[in-house]
């Protein structure tokens, strides 16, 4: 990865993993990294040519790094790709502007499976409340002051009932298209720079990080994830070149 990836600052539009540990280098072959002019996000590889992230991670210039672990020391199989096509779920309701925060990106060239690159499966069912899920990313590992690591951090968090997020964020309309996850006592959370990254529950990808409180990792302040289970028909239709497919209602 180029030197400019060793950033010490990112805008508050991105989110982090606090309270976790360095991910095992072999546990995240599907995890990709987007770095663009001080902003960075996580992405998830779902097949050789397509990745998922949050719609709010969209930028004009979007280099996507795959097969990456240590930002300052490239893996032999690390590659860079750029978006060929981007697809989002349009949502014109300002009140629900964070609803449907998902973007499907076609890479400019396919990637090959390798030691550090492999896709993850889409969900075929909903994870149950109480599930232990895994979050990961290169986001800040401290709060409220940010510290950005050279390696991705991973943490185990719990999946909660939607009412927990309703109670935590009264001003925020938690919809059925979101998953609510965190650690109620605090201390573990996603954070600055983790936006767009995956929520992994029992094997498959189940969510895309799109919103959390600032500062991160406070007690009783879980984060919100776009619910992956709602989107496979939309994703598969677009991949099959039915680009007029409408999003879930």
UniProtKB/Swiss-Prot annotation:
Residues 17-240 form the Peptidase S1 domain. Glycoprotein, contains approx. 52% carbohydrate which could be removed by N-glycosidase. Glycosylation is important, since deglycosylated barnettobin loses its clotting and defibrinogenating effects. The active site is at 56 (charge relay system), 101 (charge relay system), 195 (charge relay system). One of its GO terms (biological process) is proteolysis. Residues 1-10 form the signal peptide. Glycans are attached at residues 145, 161, 242. Optimum temperature is 40 degrees Celsius. Keywords: Blood coagulation cascade activating toxin, Disulfide bond, Fibrinogenolytic toxin, Fibrinolytic toxin, Glycoprotein, Hemostasis impairing toxin, Hydrolase, Protease, Secreted, Serine protease, Signal, Toxin, Zymogen. Expressed by the venom gland. SMART domains: Tryp_SPc. Disulfide bonds join 23-154, 41-57, 89-247, 133-201, 165-180, 191-216. It is found in: Secreted. Monomer. Belongs to the peptidase S1 family. Snake venom subfamily. This is Thrombin-like enzyme barnettobin. It comes from Bothrops barnetti (Barnett's lancehead).
């Amino acid at each position: 990865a180029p030197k400019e990836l060793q950033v010490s600052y990112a805008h508050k539009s991105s989110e982090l993993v606090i309270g976790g540990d360095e991910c095992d280098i072999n546990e995240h072959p599907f995890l990709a990294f987007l770095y663009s002019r001080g902003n960075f996000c996580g992405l998830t590889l779902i097949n050789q040519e397509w990745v998922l992230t949050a719609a709010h991670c969209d930028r004009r210039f979007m280099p996507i790094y795959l097969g990456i672990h240590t930002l300052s020391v490239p893996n032999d199989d690390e590659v860079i790709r750029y978006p060929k096509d981007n697809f989002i779920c349009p949502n014109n309701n300002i009140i629900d502007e964070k609803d449907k925060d998902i973007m499907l990106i076609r890479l400019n060239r396919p990637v090959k499976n390798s030691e550090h690159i492999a896709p993850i499966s889409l969900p075929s069912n909903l994870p149950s409340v109480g599930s232990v899920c895994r979050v990961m990313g290169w986001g800040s590992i401290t709060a409220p002051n940010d510290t950005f690591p050279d390696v991705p951090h991973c943490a185990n968090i719990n999946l909660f009932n939607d009412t927990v997020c309703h109670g935590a964020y009264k001003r925020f309309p938690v919809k059925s298209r979101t998953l609510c996850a965190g650690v109620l006592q605090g201390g573990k959370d996603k954070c600055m720079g983790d936006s767009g990254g995956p929520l992994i529950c029992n094997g498959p990808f189940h969510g895309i990080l799109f919103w959390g409180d600032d500062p991160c990792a406070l007690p009783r302040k879980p984060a919100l994830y776009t619910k992956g289970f709602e989107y496979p028909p939309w994703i598969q239709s677009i991949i099959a070149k039915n680009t007029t497919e409408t999003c879930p209602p």
